[in-house]
Amino acid sequence: MSTPIVDCHTHTSFSDGTSTFEQNVAAAARAGVRVLACTDHLTLPASMEAVADAQVPHARLAEHRAAFERARETAAEVAPGLELVYGFECDWYPGCEGNVRAWAAGAAFTLGSVHWVGDAGDVAAGTTGEPGTERVAPAGQPGSGAGWVDFADDMHVWEELGADEVWRRYADAWCAACESPLGFSSMAHPDLPARFSAQGWAPTIDLVPLWDRMAECARSTGRHVEVSTAGLRKSCETFYPSAGLLRRFARAGVPITVGSDAHRAADVAHAIRDAYRYAAAAGYASVDAPTPDGDWQTFSL
C-alpha cells in the first residue's frame, strides 16, 4: 500500500499566496491528498515589515480562521477523506514568543521558520498596519547586518555579511528557534540560505559542523523538521534540506514532515512522492503529519 499524500505547508492569499482556501482544497482533492495543513505566514511586528503584504494582518486573523472553517466544511463535502489542519508558518526572531503565542492562538500546527537574521527592532511596538505603527523604527536597514535572507529584491544582508556569515547566523537563529519555548511543531525548510547558492552566494566554509549542530538541536529539543519540495521550484533546483543535512537528521532520529510550500493551488502536493523517495534514500522509514486536533499520525514510507 502506497504512502498517503500529505502536504504540511501551504499558503493562501491571506498572506503571500495567490489562491483561496477553497482552491487549495480543490487542488488537494484532485491530487488525492490525505492531510493538508494550511500554514499562512503569521502576523509580524511593524519593525520587521512595514507593509502587510506577506503575512496575515492582525486585523484579519479572525476572518482568516472563519475562512478556514468554511473551507473545512467544503472539504467535508467534496473530499471526505481529506483532513484539513489549521496552522501558521511562524517566523522566529529575537523576542517573538509573546507575539506568536497571541497571534497563533488556536493553531493545531505551527511551522517554525527562520527568514530573518539579526536585530528585529522593537518587536513589542505593534503589528504591521495598526494605528501608530508607522512611527515604529524599521529594523533591517542597509548597513545593519540584519534583515531577510530570502528576499531576492533586497540582498543587503548577503552583501554586508557574505555567504559564510549568513549561514553561520542562520544556523544560530535556527537552533534558537528549535530551543524556543514555543515548541514549534516542525521546522520549515531547514537550510533556506541554499536558495541563493546557484546565484553567486554559495558558502565557502564547510557546512558539516553547522549541519551537525542543527541535527543535535532538533534532536535534543524534540522538533520535527520539514522536507520541502519548494527548492525544486527555485534556482537551487533541489529539496530543502540538502541530502547531507537530511542524512544527519535521520541518523539523529529527528522525525520529518513533508510540504510543498505552495503559494498557488497548482503547487499543492507538488513532488510529494519524490520527497518520500528522497527521505527514504536518506534513511527515513516514515513521515509524520499533524491531525486537526494537534496530535501526530505516522505513515510508513
Question: What is the predicted role of each segment?
Answer:
Residues M1-P94, T127-E130, V136, P193-A198, ...:
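An N-terminally biased module of ancient metal coordination in phosphate/nucleic-acid-related enzymes
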Residues T3-D7, V35, G81-G87, A108-L111, ...:
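Structural preference for beta-strand elements that scaffold enzyme active sites
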Residues D267-L301:
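Mid-to-C-terminal alpha-helical segments outside catalytic/metal-binding sites
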Residues A29, C178-S180, A250, A280:
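Non-catalytic positions within long, well-ordered alpha-helices that form the structural scaffold/packing
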Residues D206-S260, R264-V268, A285:
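Active-site-adjacent C-terminal substructures of enzyme catalytic domains
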Residues H9, A28, T110, H189, ...:
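Conserved, mostly hydrophobic/aromatic
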Residues G98-V100, G244, D274:
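A short acidic, amphipathic alpha-helical/loop segment
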Residues H58-S220:
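Extended substrate/RNA-proximal surfaces in nucleic-acid metabolism proteins
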